Amino acid sequence: MSKRPTQLVQTNTPSDGLVRLWMLRILVKLKAHKNFLDVMGYENSAIASYLGLQRAEEFCDETIDTSSLEFNFDAKKALAAMRQGHLRAEKNSANYHVQPELTQNIKRLSEVVLLNQVEIDLLQFTVILNTHSLLDNVADYLGGMSSTELYRTLTVLLGHSERD
């Protein structure tokens, strides 16, 4: 999960819903929002825009001097909005899919090397993580972790039980 310059990502691809779900799981369920939200707003406005979050200015406290908007950003309100977005994404998760071409290629590979569903999901996530710069940037908010933490993170992120 290397730091790349933020760039615009093609939207309206078949996997956009799934990518947004993974991003929101990282930010909300895995608490990476602590590195994404600060007193000045969103750490990365391209991520906020991709997730459909309101502009940072809309979470500012109107009672504070508006000449210093960057210092009155209400991260709690922004987090509440992210949580709502996460709940909506989870509710619609059955409708999210990986690009058909990737699904077909991984299916062929899984037949050759006999991958189970968890391994298929890990491979799909890894491929998309390495091709989607904003997902990669969000994953960077998790920081370094031990192998045990990585295992737990992937379990939460991909929606599997720890026994899987």
Segment roles from a protein language model:
Residues M1-D164:
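Intrinsically disordered, low-complexity N-terminal extensions of AAA+/P-loop NTPases
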